[in-house]
Amino acid sequence: MTSGKNGLTYADAGVDIDAGNELVDRIKPAAKRTNRPGVMSGLGGFGALFDLKAAGYEDPILVGATDGVGTKLRIAIDTGLVDGVGIDLVAMCVNDLVCQGAEPLFFLDYFATGKLETDVAARIIEGIAEGCVRSGCALIGGETAEMPGMYPKGDFDLAGFAVGAMERGTALPAGVSEGDVLLGLASDGVHSNGYSLVRQIVKYSGLGWDGDNPFGEGKLGEALLTPTRLYVKQSLAAVRAGGVNALAHITGGGLTENLPRVLPDDLGADIDLGAWELPGVFKWMAQTGGIEESEMLKTFNCGIGMILVVKADRADALTEVLEGEGETVARLGTVTRGEGIRYTGALL
């Protein structure tokens, strides 16, 4: 064993333990704000504990989901506007959970970077905590990995992990039938999918992230970083009201690829593309990039972030429930015999 004043340290290798500890201290209040019934431990342990009985479950089935934010992070890194990507991370996971009929219970995050910048990391994790508060789940743990040589200066990556539960026998999808009505919930923009194409379109346009937004107010970068909408509380309110047979989170693959994931093999859907107004961001991208309608529909959410498949005789009542929760609801079409999605009308 060697010793001496000139011996190497972990800090010499580029890992700042003190910065990591400072980050934990800074984010503890944000994590504490997410506490809910069932949480049994705080940050800092080797594992996090959650009591399903204390959360009100008698015979629960657990559901897990994991996701990231994709290349939307590139825009956040380049602009320094990182506060919303934590909400994106939570939304991408918990919106998937509710498609199984599950209530999100807890969330864990993974933040990786080459050099830990405490303020940047704290802003991101505070965004994660905000997403957890809005969706009713607890931020009970996470990992901050400082890995010198693995990422260019200023770059980072994120991953999220969510666990939810529902009582046995209540899992979705269930009972989807021909004639069911499709209720679409409006998106808040591009959300967190298709950003490799988004970035190509912006490059082709010649605009910068700090340029004026060509489809609305503010700057282009700010507009494209609008956080993914959280559909948890409103979707679960509809499920509890009765008559919801399935939910589809419209992410990568757009309407064309995601809705069939919750339909039986022998059923498809007819969707009227005139049932909702295409948001300006999608009009601008289609026009600027010369993107065909079919490509838009299998890449982006095109203004519909979640679809509920509901019994026809419950469609009106569930529309009222969703609108009462603050949602903009469009009646998109119906479930039909035969595979695939058939579109009528025009998107563009």
UniProtKB/Swiss-Prot annotation:
Native source organism of the sequence: Ruegeria sp. (strain TM1040) (Silicibacter sp.)
InterPro entries with a match to the protein in the record: PurM-like_C_dom, PurM-like_C_sf, PurM-like_N, PurM-like_N_sf, PurM_cligase
Pathway info: Purine metabolism; IMP biosynthesis via de novo pathway; 5-amino-1-(5-phospho-D-ribosyl)imidazole from N(2)-formyl-N(1)-(5-phospho-D-ribosyl)glycinamide: step 2/2
One Gene Ontology term from the biological process aspect of the record: 'de novo' IMP biosynthetic process
Family: Belongs to the AIR synthase family.
Family annotation (Pfam families): AIRS (PF00586), AIRS_C (PF02769)
Lineage of the species this protein comes from: Bacteria, Pseudomonadati, Pseudomonadota, Alphaproteobacteria, Rhodobacterales
Chief location of this protein within or outside the cell: cytoplasm
Name recorded for this polypeptide: Phosphoribosylformylglycinamidine cyclo-ligase
Keyword Plastid belongs to the record: no
